[in-house]
Design a protein with these regions (language model features):
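Alpha/beta-hydrolase superfamily serine-hydrolase fold, recognizing
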Residues: 1-171
């Protein structure tokens, strides 16, 4: 299982997610790989996507796994990275992973979807306080990892909610 950690692309690490991924390894009986991908604001998009694809391909080319033996996933920004990695692999006509497992994926970093409401913020103990602060300050969290000049909200490799997942593995 290739698991991309969350942290808004600006924090988090394999170590910060040790407890979670250890639990996932225990209940699944499989090895869980957690790459230490580059973070913002020092490393801007597409550094994270490049690292996501490179790590997946390394499991195949360097470690001898078949794509059918690999599931990818992640939480929050790691869920975003799993989705954009999947879409990039599809674009490259690469062999896709067997499945994708997501925990509260950051599929719409712009926060422009209908599900981002004040009501949701009151119910979501993880993201609620963050979203309220973002709305209050009219801020965009994705600026931690995407340069303003590069933002393209229609690009599914940045904002995967609108991606084409036809012929992709189960998500």
């Amino acid at each position: 299982f290739l698991y991309y950690h969350g942290g808004g692309y600006s924090m988090g690490s394999p170590e910060s997610h040790y407890s979670l991924v250890s639990y996932l390894a225990d209940i699944s009986g499989t090895t869980v790989y957690v790459p230490d991908y580059r973070l913002g604001p020092e490393n801007k998009y597409p550094a994270q996507l490049d690292d996501g694809v490179k790590t997946y391909m390394s499991l195949i080319n360097d470690f001898g796994y078949s794509h059918n033996q690999i599931a990818i996933g992640g939480d929050s920004a790691g869920g975003n990275l799993a989705l954009i990695t999947l879409l990039k692999l599809k674009e490259l006509n690469a062999n896709l992973p067997s499945s994708v497992a997501l925990l509260s994926p950051w599929a719409d970093p712009s926060g422009s979807g209908e599900s981002y409401t004040e009501d949701m913020a009151d119910r979501d103990i993880l993201l609620g306080p963050i979203m309220k602060n973002v709305w209050k300050n009219d801020d965009e969290l994705y600026h931690f990892y995407i340069d303003e000049k590069d933002v393209d909200k229609k690009n599914a490799l940045m904002f995967p909610l609108g991606g084409d997942y036809k012929n992709c593995p189960p998500i």
